[in-house]
Curated annotation (Swiss-Prot):
InterPro entries: dUTPase (IPR008181), dUTPase-like (IPR029054), dUTPase-like_sf (IPR036157), dUTPase_trimeric (IPR033704)
Pathway the protein takes part in: Pyrimidine metabolism; dUMP biosynthesis; dUMP from dCTP (dUTP route): step 2/2
GO biological process, one term: dUMP biosynthetic process
Protein name stated in the entry: Deoxyuridine 5'-triphosphate nucleotidohydrolase
Coiled-coil regions listed: none
Keywords: Hydrolase, Magnesium, Metal-binding, Nucleotide metabolism
Residues annotated for substrate binding in this entry: R71, S72, G73, N84, L88, I89, D90, M98
Stated role: This enzyme is involved in nucleotide metabolism: it produces dUMP, the immediate precursor of thymidine nucleotides and it decreases the intracellular concentration of dUTP so that uracil cannot be incorporated into DNA.
Pfam families hit by this protein: dUTPase (PF00692)
UniProt EC number: 3.6.1.23
Cofactor(s), by name: Mg(2+)
A GO term, aspect molecular function: magnesium ion binding
């Protein structure tokens, strides 16, 4: 299913020097987001920084949200993940997409201008209304939590 999402280019290099976000393959779930930087940024181990994308989106449809996720290769090979682990973009947000980048690795990492640094997916949203109750209907699991079902 394809859905039209309004995008505003905030940095004139986007669409020229830096490509617009695209799906890498026909089966890709995530759009690659690029670091819209003037100069390379070096991240020491344990450091975080906010990286601009040069883009703003307006989803408008309250039944959708966007999520920013780390790119698997950067996380696995270099320890580069999102500082907030997952970025959530609400349907009514219209500001620049910023990527919180965290170097959880052992070595410094340099983010280059235009580098693909995160990915964004669109997900359905259900807004819940709480129904106050005294007790829940009984289930087999009950209050069994962490480790409840074992490892095997």
């Amino acid at each position: 299913m394809m859905k039209k999402i309004d995008v505003k280019i905030l940095d004139p290099r986007v669409g020229k020097e830096f490509p617009l976000p695209t799906y890498a393959t026909s089966g890709s779930a995530g759009l690659d987001l690029r670091a819209c930087l003037d100069d390379a940024v070096e991240l020491a181990p344990g450091d975080t920084t906010l990286v601009p994308t040069g883009l703003a989106i307006h989803i408008a449809d309250p039944s959708l949200a966007a999520m920013m996720l780390p790119r698997s290769g950067l996380g696995h090979k270099h320890g580069i993940v999102l500082g907030n682990l997952v970025g959530l973009i609400d349907s009514d947000y219209q500001g620049q997409l910023m990527i919180s980048v965290w170097n959880r690795g052992q070595d410094s990492f340099t983010i280059q201008p235009g580098e693909r640094i995160a990915q964004m997916i669109f997900v359905p949203v259900v807004q819940a209304e709480f129904n106050l109750v005294e007790d829940f209907d009984a289930t087999d699991r009950g209050e069994g939590g962490f480790g409840h079902s074992g490892r095997q």
